[in-house]
A protein has these predicted regions:
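Glycine-rich loops and low-complexity Gly/Arg-rich segments
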Residues: 46-48, 59-63, 81-86, 116
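Acidic-leaning, charged glycine-interspersed low-complexity segments
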Residues: 77-116
Length: 116
């Protein structure tokens, strides 16, 4: 039985190695940076919480497309290797790139399950 959800904590540990990383809203105006949103929900059995499952969106913002892509690829690599195993199971479910007002954004979406 799981007592505490740690998906956001682990994601922050992995992504903050590559870029300033924030939950929901950036606390900076300097590029590059990334923000994430997460909607963890417990999945119950008769014994209590079996696991948590979250839809997670990570968006990298930068004025330089190549740098945004490099940061995004590093985050993808770390999430897929660092959040798959006994404690977590992750899969990437989306990847989009956009440019608005000369700022590039690359959004990656994941489904992440936490088992321990």
């Amino acid at each position: 039985m799981i007592r505490k959800e740690t998906i956001g904590i682990r994601l922050t540990e992995l992504a903050s190695k590559h870029v300033e990383f924030y939950f929901s809203e950036a606390q900076t105006e300097e590029y590059p940076y990334a923000v994430y949103t997460s909607s963890p929900s417990p999945v119950y059995t008769k014994d209590g919480i079996h696991h948590y499952e979250a839809t997670v969106a990570v968006t990298v913002y930068d004025k330089i497309l190549d740098r945004a892509n490099s940061i995004a690829e590093s985050i993808i690599k770390d999430v897929m290797s660092g959040m798959n195993g006994d404690q977590y199971a992750s899969r990437m479910t989306g990847d989009t790139t956009d440019c608005t007002d000369e700022v590039w954004s690359r959004e990656m979406t994941f489904t992440i399950k936490q088992y321990q």
